[in-house]
């Protein structure tokens, strides 16, 4: 599994937050920026919120950029259920960015459900990575 620049910045943001510093870091780019979710949930965690606010900061600095947020799920559940869950995850991520001032027209959403796992395999150590919303530049 590759670790993107954004993932490293998200880690820095989490460390700064733990130290009482700013918890929002603007990424250098949006190369497969991801936020992760708990099982059967589309709720945005504080770590995910910081990540998404960093994405919004990037979009504010790059007004011509449009993105797509793809919601994903782990392999448990039916195809239909996971497609709906993936869409809720993508929509929840989009909502955070839009509430921070980004025009909703710049963000499209799609769900892949369980069809495009980030990591192949079974078990929670794998599934936790497949429950995500991934932002890519269009």
Label the model's feature ranges.
Residues 1-8:
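Bacterial N-terminal signal peptides that target proteins for export
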Residues 10-13:
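Hydrophobic helical h-region of N-terminal Sec-dependent signal peptides
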Residues 15-18:
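C-terminal motif of bacterial Sec signal peptides marking the signal peptidase cleavage site
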Residues 24-54, 74-79, 117:
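Short, solvent-exposed beta-strand/turn patches at coil↔beta or beta↔helix junctions
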Residues 28-29, 125-129:
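Extracellular/periplasmic catalytic domains that process cell-envelope and extracellular macromolecules
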Residues 47-54, 80, 84, 88, ...:
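Extracytoplasmic/secreted proteins, especially bacterial periplasmic and envelope-associated proteins
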Residues 64-72, 87-118, 131-138:
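A non-catalytic structural micro-motif
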Residues 120-123:
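Short beta-alpha junctions and helix-cap segments that line functional grooves
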């Amino acid at each position: 599994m590759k670790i993107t620049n954004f993932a490293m910045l998200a880690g820095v943001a989490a460390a700064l937050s733990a130290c009482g510093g700013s918890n929002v870091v603007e990424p250098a780019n949006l190369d497969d920026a991801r936020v992760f979710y708990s099982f059967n949930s589309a709720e945005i965690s504080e770590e995910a919120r910081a990540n998404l606010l960093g994405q919004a900061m990037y979009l504010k600095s790059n007004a011509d950029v449009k993105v797509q947020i793809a919601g994903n799920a782990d392999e448990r559940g039916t195809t239909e259920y996971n497609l709906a869950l993936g869409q809720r995850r993508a929509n929840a991520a989009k909502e955070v960015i839009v509430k921070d001032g980004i025009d909703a027209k710049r963000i499209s959403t799609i769900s892949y459900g369980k069809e495009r796992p980030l990591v192949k395999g079974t078990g929670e150590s794998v599934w936790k990575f497949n429950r995500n919303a991934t932002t890519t530049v269009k």
